[in-house]
């Protein structure tokens, strides 16, 4: 009995060898499939960090200050931090701004930097060229946000540096540090996508506290834009109430928005200030206005940002009284918007010696236009195929079959009405298919048209009219842009052409009240003037 039972148990025992082999093969197939769908196609590009840094990871418990090196490395990997940590950094830095004067007073040595515009990876190159913030005094002239796709990283990193080095790193306000421009351009959308609207609101409150100007070494007035007909002395700047959204006119607006005349130093008339027709607000100021202000306030020069420069900087005509350039423009965003192909520059001033250091752009991760995700981007492709299938399905039923079916089913006028409803639906789906097809084949034209049209939206009816409608709308928008100084061609071949095409985006956006326009001063675009003091160091290749 015992042997019989053992034999039966032996016969009933399953064969585990084949089962184990099958499971192992299945696991290998799953791993292969998983690797196929998760492995990076471009292996040199790292996958963005998904984990957000906590407050404890961002802040050093011993010092109570942000670990800016940790933030830098995390942001380089496209990482983000928890909202609580982001808000704490911004609010702590805002308290420092509020305790600073409207016009800072900074002693040399100092390194002056121009526009950053959300180009975080180029900001890393800037610190590599200019020196560590731990050992180098920095003054930034504003425009940290908009246009580029890493604006919030620039803000959080610079604000963290300010907390760590409050007496050696200084930040001024630019014209883009306001609600009006950040809503119109990209910063608000970026904050909502990467963090939340609350983070955006905290940033706006912080921007309201930024100083407006700096007196460097008692010799140089540093400001984002330039002069104002309402500002005659440095005391006029000190008296400005800066804790607010910048107005559309007045001295605060002028400090952020004004520009030198295009024929600065070679003016055809003696007018010191004229309406800024390029910006749509504020003023152009002349060489005479600049020299008068410098002489009246016993200054050597004005250092400002606000305008892209092919070489990253520009030194204007020398003052007859001092023999020093009366005006210097610094721009620190290389290959601006990924199309200008310009160099960036920073200005180092030490021991009464001014040194310009140039640098080129650095590689950065790619974002689809307007922070679009891949699903939104691919919607026209998917939509085209889905609507094609629907149209084919509906077209299976011919008009004769439709009439015969409706005659049998409905009595009187009900059948005719039903047929008309079905025909309307077929035509509507066909129209939708046409729109998706246009989007599919003309995606580049749509992007160009969105870029030209105010607010980044398509003109009404452009898609429904098909390719002809898109081309017609594009020609109309191009002609409108040309009236604002844009080149009619859309293949950008030079820095000057890029600047002309982008001129429409340099204006103050609509829906903001501006004072009555004065007679604009029309001047030709000047050729590059010979700089009285060439840079001592050439560009460093990235």
Curated annotation (Swiss-Prot):
Phenotype upon changing residue 259 to N: In p675; impaired thermotaxis and chemotaxis towards NaCl, hypersensitivity to low osmotic conditions, enhanced olfactory adaptation to isoamyl alcohol
Uppermost EC category: hydrolase
Residues under site feature: Interaction with PxVP motif in substrate: 377
CDD domains with a match to the protein in the record: MPP_PP2B
Role of this protein: Calcium-dependent, calmodulin-stimulated protein phosphatase. Dephosphorylates arrd-17. Dephosphorylates daf-16 at 'Ser-319' which regulates daf-16 nuclear translocation. Dephosphorylates calcium permeable cation channel pkd-2 at 'Ser-534'. Regulates male mating behavior including response to hermaphrodite contact and vulva location and localization of pkd-2 to neuronal cilium. Negatively regulates several sensory behaviors including thermotaxis in ADF neurons, osmosensation in ASH neurons, olfaction adaptation in AWC neurons and sensitivity to CO2 levels.
Composition-biased stretches (Pro residues): 532-542
Chain span(s) of sequence motif SAPNY motif: 332-336
Stretches the record annotates as Calcineurin B binding: 366-394
Subcellular localization(s) per the UniProt record: Perikaryon; Cell projection, Cilium; Cytoplasm
Source organism phylogeny: Eukaryota, Metazoa, Ecdysozoa, Nematoda, Chromadorea
UniProt name for this protein: Serine/threonine-protein phosphatase 2B catalytic subunit
Tissue: Expressed in head and tail neurons, ventral nerve cord, body wall and vulva muscles, sperm and spermatheca. Expressed in hypodermal seam cells. Expressed in intestinal and anal depressor muscles. In male, expressed in CEM, HOB and ray RnB neurons. Isoform a: Expressed in thermosensory ADF neurons, chemosensory ASE, AWA and AWC neurons, osmosensory ASH neurons and AIY and AIZ interneurons. Expressed in body wall, vulva and pharyngeal muscles.
Sequence positions that bind Fe cation: 115, 117, 143
